[in-house]
Every structure is written in C-alpha cells, then in structure tokens.
C-alpha cells in the first residue's frame, strides 16, 4: 500500500497530505514500542498523553510517515486528518484488506454477559467443526492460539490484524466482544458485522459516558456497523430503543420475544431451560451456572439460528460449554473443605445482584461475599453495590479491587455508605486477607462469593504498579494451606 492508495480511498477524512504519493507503507502502528521499519504511525491525543510529541522517536525506529491531527514543525512525511482515531480504524481496514469480508463476523455488547455470550458463539461453532477466532476480555484466541491481555476490546489495528490472520489461516468466523469504550473511541469503525448482539443494559461506566442516555447511545452504535444484510439480536427490553433499518430479532421471556425463554432451572451442575424458537421448542442445558446464562445462551443460539444453523445442533453443542474463567467460576477444590466458592467478574450493581441471587438460590448455608470497587471509575455505583450485597448476603467483607491510583480510603468510604449497619460486615483493605477471612469464617455448606475481578491476573495499584493477583489462584493456595494444616493437626 502507498500514500496514493490511502488518499484515493480515504480522501474525505484528510485535511492535508505532505508526503510523496508513491511512498510505500508496509505496516501500521499506533504505539512507539510496536513501530517497525516502513510503518505509517498514527498520532493520537489522549487525556494523559499526546503521541504527536514522540514523532522524532518513531522516525528513528523506522516509521516512514505519520498521521497527525495538527500541523507539525518537522521535515517528515505526514497526513493531517480530522480525527486520527477514526482514520486509524479506516486505514487499518484498508491496509489489512477488509478482513471481515467473507467471514462471519459477530459483535457482542451489553453491560453484562458480553464475554460469556461471545464465548458461547465460539464454542458452538467450533463444536460444529467451524474454524475461527475470538477476542474477549477473558479469552483471546486466534485460530486456536491463545494470548492474554487485560483489555476488553483492543485497538483498531490489533483487531483488524487479528481478523486478517484469521482469514488468511482459513478462519470462517470471528467473534468479538465490543465494549462501550471501544464504540465511543471508534476502535471498531473499520469492521462490519454480520450479527450484532446487545445482551442487556444497566448502570455502569458513567464516569466515562456522563449519562445513562450516552451509555445506551454508545452501545446502540454497534448496530450502525452491521453489513447490509446484517442482523441485530437484542434483549427484548431494548426493542423500543432500536430504531435502525436492520433486521431485528429479540430474546426474552415475554410472548412478544422472537426467542422466548421459560422453565429456567439453576443448580451447582449448570443451567437448563426451554427456548421457544421460530422452528419450535428447544430444551437447552449448559454447565455455565446462573439464570443470566440462560439469556446469554438464548442470544447466542438466536444469532446462529438466524445464520442458518440448526437449533438442535446448537443446543447439543452447548451441553459441553463449561463457562468462562472468572464468570460464575466454581473453585472445585473448595469442596474438600466443605464450601462452595465462586469467583466472578461482577463489578456493577446489576451484575452483583444477579450473581448473589443465583448463589442464594442454590446454596444450603450462608452466603458470604467479598468485593471492592475499582478506582477512578463510577463512584455513584459504589454504595449501590454495597446495598445489594447487604441485602442478599449474610456477611459482607469489603476490600480493595483495583485502586488505579485513587485513595483506597476514599473508595472504602463510598462503599460503606451503602452498607446496612445492622448486618455483619468487615472492612479489610488487603484482598488476600479478606479472601482468607471469608474462607475461615465460613461453615461447612456455606457459599463464598469473591466478586469484581474475575479472571484478572494483576491488581492495578496505580499507573506505575501492577502486582500479580488472581482471585482463583489465591483461593486455591489458601485451601491447600488449610488442607495441609489439617493433615499436620491429625
């Protein structure tokens, strides 16, 4: 690709070109650590950092031109654009040759259930012999090869590069979890989806979006990115908010839903329900626990059924779906000390409420919950989460989540505002101590819920400090110590 190709395809996005039209571009990058010789480097202005300031550095690393949002006082080839984030998505799609074409492409958004629904789609398709890739918060797997990072939806270049790798490797589908941040920051503007799924919406990320209306608007933008024959699959509660021309399919429990759930039963073994589809009734079982997973499964089945897959085959393949790491993840080793322990990513009032209601429903003993709140995020939801915890758990242990540079004392103060002081609660800033205390005070048959961080492998203390910490691993380590202690005591 050369500058001429870029200009001829994206001229409406460009203010000025000061670069030879025959200049060859052999790569696209947006981070100084990833620059390679021959790259077009995209400069972006963020809240804390402006990469226009490091143009000399990327020049030294081999970039042959830069994309800027303002004029630069350097003798170096550049393209000035109106919006570098939007341009990044479009030029990446151009460079990687629209890698979503001729590939079934799924985008899944919503406050809760994004990761699980996306992984259900991936699981069902691979179980049916299809080859493809998936990018979610918890799992990133390109044609069977997995890697880890803690970003829900990567940047446009990463997404489109992965899509090209998928298509060139013979992948027939690509399933992508799409956050509201990614939609606002235009990370998926270079993608077109065959199916967009909107699982549900409740309060979250208002520190970023400002209002609930803006949050909803951001989520709905996913449907603006559908292919011409694309399908919108959404929770029936969102049907009135949908005002696009695309084909709309709903799932829910009312008689008006296109895919109607009923007879939902939850146990420690999994979740079963009946799904009324346009092709008849379907009995569905998945080892993923929680009535919310019935809704996730319904959304995933609806999406694939609309593309021509047999609902019975889809339901059969879901029987082997065991769930997602850090999403109602049962720590199996806890049975050895007589407890049920659940690790979950729930970090909003609605998610925590659904989680605790499901645990309460299938538990014989008390429910003990350990959770905190992320720093530098929506403060308003903190007391709401504590109120939910006080209402649905027998014992609440407040602890640290990811402070991200915010004073943990301030976070805790916000959380305590929602606590019912008439019920047992503890405040333990050390998360490991909080988890160990929960496992120690629990009696045989009790359920311990550790919420907020799910699969995450690091605790973010501030911008400079991340410490290794995974809730499930900590639980397993404490259980091993307890079993060892019992052995020595005998």
From Swiss-Prot:
SUPFAM superfamilies given in the database record: MurD-like peptide ligases, catalytic domain, MurD-like peptide ligases, peptide-binding domain, MurE/MurF N-terminal domain
Binding site for UDP-N-acetyl-alpha-D-muramoyl-L-alanyl-D-glutamate: 32, 152-153, 179, 185, 187
Annotated NCBIfam families: murE, PRK00139.1-4
Location(s) in or outside the cell: Cytoplasm
pH dependence: Optimum pH is 9.4 for the L-lysine adding activity.
Entry keyword Secreted: no
The organism of origin for this protein: Thermotoga maritima (strain ATCC 43589 / DSM 3109 / JCM 10099 / NBRC 100826 / MSB8)
Name of the gene: murE
One MF term in the entry's GO annotations: UDP-N-acetylmuramoyl-L-alanyl-D-glutamate-L-lysine ligase activity
Annotated InterPro entries: Folylpolyglutamate_synth_CS (IPR018109), Mur-like_cat_sf (IPR036565), Mur_ligase_C (IPR004101), Mur_ligase_C_dom_sf (IPR036615), Mur_ligase_cen (IPR013221), Mur_ligase_N (IPR000713), MurE/MurF_N (IPR035911), UDP-N-AcMur-Glu-dNH2Pim_ligase (IPR005761)
Enzyme class label: ligase
Gene Ontology biological process: cell division; cell wall organization; peptidoglycan biosynthetic process; regulation of cell shape
Domain of life: Bacteria
Keyword Cytoplasm: yes
Transmembrane segments: none
The protein's name: UDP-N-acetylmuramoyl-L-alanyl-D-glutamate--LD-lysine ligase
Amino-acid positions noted as binding ATP in the UniProt annotation, renumbered to this chain: 110-116
GO CC, alphabetical: cytoplasm
Any further remark recorded for this protein: The peptidoglycan of T.maritima was shown to contain approximate amounts of both enantiomers of lysine and no diaminopimelate.
Family (UniProt): Belongs to the MurCDEF family. MurE subfamily.
């Amino acid at each position: 690709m050369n500058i001429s190709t870029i200009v001829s395809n994206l001229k409406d996005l460009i203010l000025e070109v000061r670069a030879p039209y025959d200049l060859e571009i052999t790569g696209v990058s947006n981070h100084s650590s990833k620059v390679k010789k021959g790259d077009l480097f995209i400069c972006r202005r963020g809240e804390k950092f402006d990469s226009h300031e490091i143009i000399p550095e990327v020049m030294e690393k081999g970039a042959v031109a830069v994309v800027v949002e303002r004029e630069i006082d350097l003798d170096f080839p550049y393209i000035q654009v109106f919006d570098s984030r939007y341009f990044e998505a479009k030029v990446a799609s151009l460079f990687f040759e629209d890698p979503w074409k001729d590939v079934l492409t799924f985008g899944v958004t919503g406050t809760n259930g994004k990761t699980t629904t996306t992984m259900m789609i991936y699981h069902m398709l691979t179980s049916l012999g299809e080859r493809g890739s998936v990018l979610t918060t918890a799992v990133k797997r390109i044609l069977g090869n997995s890697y880890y990072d803690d970003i829900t939806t990567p940047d446009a270049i990463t997404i489109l590069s992965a899509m090209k790798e998928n298509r060139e490797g013979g992948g027939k589908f690509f399933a992508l979890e799409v956050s509201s941040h990614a939609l606002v920051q235009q990370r998926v503007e270079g993608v077109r989806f065959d199916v967009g799924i909107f699982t549900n919406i409740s309060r979250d990320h208002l520190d970023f979006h400002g209002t609930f209306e803006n949050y909803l608007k951001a989520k709905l933008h996913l449907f603006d990115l559908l292919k011409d024959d694309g399908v919108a699959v959404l929770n029936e509660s969102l049907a009135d908010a949908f005002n696009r021309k695309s084909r709309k399919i709903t799932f829910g429990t009312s008689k008006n839903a296109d895919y109607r759930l009923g007879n939902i039963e939850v146990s420690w073994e999994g979740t079963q329900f009946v799904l009324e589809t346009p092709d008849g009734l379907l009995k569905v079982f998945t080892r993923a626990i929680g009535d919310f997973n019935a809704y996730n499964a319904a959304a995933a089945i609806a999406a694939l059924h609309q593309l021509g897959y047999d609902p019975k085959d889809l339901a059969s393949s879901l029987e082997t779906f065991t769930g997602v790491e850090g999403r109602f993840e049962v720590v199996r080793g806890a049975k050895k000390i007589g407890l049920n322990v659940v690790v979950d990513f729930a970090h909003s009032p609605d998610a925590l409420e659904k989680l605790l209601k499901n645990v309460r429903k299938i538990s014989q003993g008390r429910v003990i919950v350990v959770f905190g709140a992320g720093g530098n995020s929506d403060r308003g939801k903190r007391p709401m989460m504590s109120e939910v915890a006080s209402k649905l758990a027998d014992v609440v242990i407040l602890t640290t989540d990811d402070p991200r540079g915010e004073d943990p004392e301030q976070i805790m103060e916000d959380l305590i505002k929602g606590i019912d002081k008439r019920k047992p609660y503890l405040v333990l800033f050390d998360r490991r101590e909080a988890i160990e205390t929960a496992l120690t005070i629990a009696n045989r048959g009790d359920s311990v819920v550790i919420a907020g961080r799910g699969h995450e492998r690091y605790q973010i203390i501030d911008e400079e400090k991340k410490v290794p910490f995974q809730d499930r691993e900590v639980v397993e380590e404490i259980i091993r110590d307890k079993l060892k202690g019992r052995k020595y005591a005998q």
